[in-house]
Structure formats: structure tokens, C-alpha cells
């Protein structure tokens, strides 16, 4: 890999764009409005085209004003169609997005004859050539870095200025209103930031990367943390890392398969997606692997309690120890899962084993007694408040007994017998 100054600036510009998009993107994700970033990123196209047609140049101020105005119109139309048309927000965004984007493409075709503009550049970007677009007095800094860096600073300024307001309105607009915060103003402030950020990055990196960086880094951070401040910082870091990883991948990975390279903007978006998948799988709090392990432990815990309850009921009928096959048939679980649970219960001293037969120990007896007591109290409670047939009553209690806390048990009351006429064990 032959790294040059151009590669460094490509990564810097991509990182500035990603960080700038991640700031409003974080609020969009928290407000469950991620697709609004997608919609605005595309619907600012008419504003850009109108600015081209009116001014006859690529004046950034005119582009910014046109894009922001159309972005705010997009947000207004989405809310208006949702409330007046009584349709859900996704449908209203789809209507506004497709109509305005198509209108923008029509205008863009008209602008081609009057202004030096490439629609493919606007849609897909040309970050690989951003280094060559420099202002004469720009001290060797690409214009894309200046524009996206300025947008990042502006977004950071407004985020810090309205940090509390953005936080409260993202989670509870009603609470924000009660504290004197105007949720409508904050909403359109967010839409303005989104539209301005989109147009700042459009020509340099294209709409594909803009949309990806609005959504993917904040969504990835959302999986990794539940703290607002950490979420914002993590979104910025993930966006910057995705930009660097994407460019390195764009110039190295294709060579493994005999190709010279690929589009950097697309590779940056893919890198962000890869980071999201890794977070989705391995997040310590919400990752797929953690959930699978938690579900496995939960199933094992429930099966262990079912074994103790079954052994207790067998002893209640004075039938002595229980054979493994009898447990397997009664509980309806696989032999492997049952064997693991039995070994663990023996190891913890809850049951003892003689040949292929099992019996409760003293500690296991106490634990099983408490479990059966809760089960039968649930049957009493459900029969009194939610009458149902005896089989359904037993099944409902069998599920509830595993999740009952001491506070829940205190509301179940007391009883001598359950609806089946069986005695409720004492809690002593």
C-alpha cells in the first residue's frame, strides 16, 4: 500500500463529514427519525438545483440557503401529511422524499446546461478527487475539508449550546414543554442542522455516504451505551474510525481479488455497516451473543427449578427417588440439557445421586419448598382474579413461579390449599 498526502486528506475529509453528520444523526436516532436524515439528504437536491439555476454558479452560500429552505419544507410537509392525511410517519416521509427527490433530478438536468455540475458527483460523490479542489488562498487545504470542518464546528457549537434542550426533547417533548423549552423550535433546529450538513457534504462525498453517516454511527453507538453524552461522543468516534477504515479498505481489499481499487465513499459506508454488525453481535449490553448467553442461562435456570419442583412433588407423594428417564419424560427436554442441569445441581449440593436415581438434599428441599409454595400461591391468586381451567391455571403458575420476586410474593397473600386441593407448603 503506497500511502500519499492525497490519501491523508481523503481520510480527513471523510472523517470531518462523518463527525459532522453524526451530531444531528444522534438526535435523529434517539427520536426514532433516522429516515428523516435520509429524506432530507435527498430532498435538498431541489434546493441545490434551484440555487444553481438562479445564481448560475456553485456559490456555497446560495447552495446552503436553498438546501436548508427545502430541508425545512421537507420536515414541515412530512408532519403535515402525517397529521392531515392520518398516515404513519414512514409513509409520509416516503411521499415527500420521492416527489421532491424526483423534482430535484429534473431541475438538476436543467442545471447541467447552465452550470458546471455533475449529477453523479452529487449522488455518489468524488472524495478521491477532493484534494485537487483547493482555493488559491486555502493554504493547501482542500475546499472539502474547509466546508465539512466548518459544518462540524457549527454542529458542535449548536449541540453544546442546546445540549440540555436536545436531550430533553429527544426523550420527552411533553416534559421539555413543561420546562419552557419549545419542542417545535428544537425540531426545526435539528432539521436545519441536518439539511446544512447534507449540502456541505453532498458534492465532496455524495448522498450515499451522507445518509450512512447520519444513521449508522449513531445507531452503532446506541447499541453500545445508554448514556446520552457517551452516545454523542461514541457516534463521533465511530464515524471517524469508519472513514479511516473505509479508505484503507478501498485501496487494499480489492487488490486481494485482482482489482486496483474501489470507490472510497462506498467503502466508508460499508465500513460503518461492518462496525454496526460487530456491535450488534458483541455489544456487552445488547449484543446478539450476550442475549444468546443470557437466554441459555435463563433456560438452564428454569430447567433446574423445574427439576427441583418435580423431585419435591414426587417426595410429597412418598414415591422416593426419581430415575433419569422419568425426569426426561416428565419435563420434556433433551437428554443433553437435562444431564448438564443435573450435574450442576449435584455439584451445588441441591440433589444427590444414587446410580441413575436422584433425590433432594436438605438445601435442595428448602429451595424446592419455596418454589412450590410460590407456584401454588399463584394458582390461588389466578383462580381468584382470573378464573381459568385447571390445566391453564397450572401452566400459567409454572411460568410465573420462575420470575416472582419477594415484592411480588408479598402481594399473593397466603392460603392453606391451592385450587386443586393440594396443601400450600409453609414458608418457614
Regions from the language model: what does each represent?
Residues 17-22, 48, 52, 72-76, ...:
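Hydrophobic core segments of alpha-helical transmembrane domains in multi-pass membrane transport
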Residues 268-310, 402, 406-428:
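Membrane-interfacial segments at transmembrane helix termini in multi-pass membrane proteins
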Residues 1-18:
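Membrane-interfacial amphipathic/re-entrant helices at transmembrane-helix boundaries
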Residues 317-428:
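Structured cytosolic domains appended to multi-pass membrane proteins
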Residues 101-158:
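Transmembrane helix-bundle core of multi-pass membrane transporters
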Residues 26-117, 221-240, 248-261:
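Short loop segments and helix-boundary regions at transmembrane helix junctions
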Residues 11-16, 64-69, 91-95, 145-150, ...:
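Hydrophobic alpha-helical transmembrane segments
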Residues 140-212:
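Helix-loop-helix "hairpin" substructures at the membrane interface of multi-pass membrane proteins
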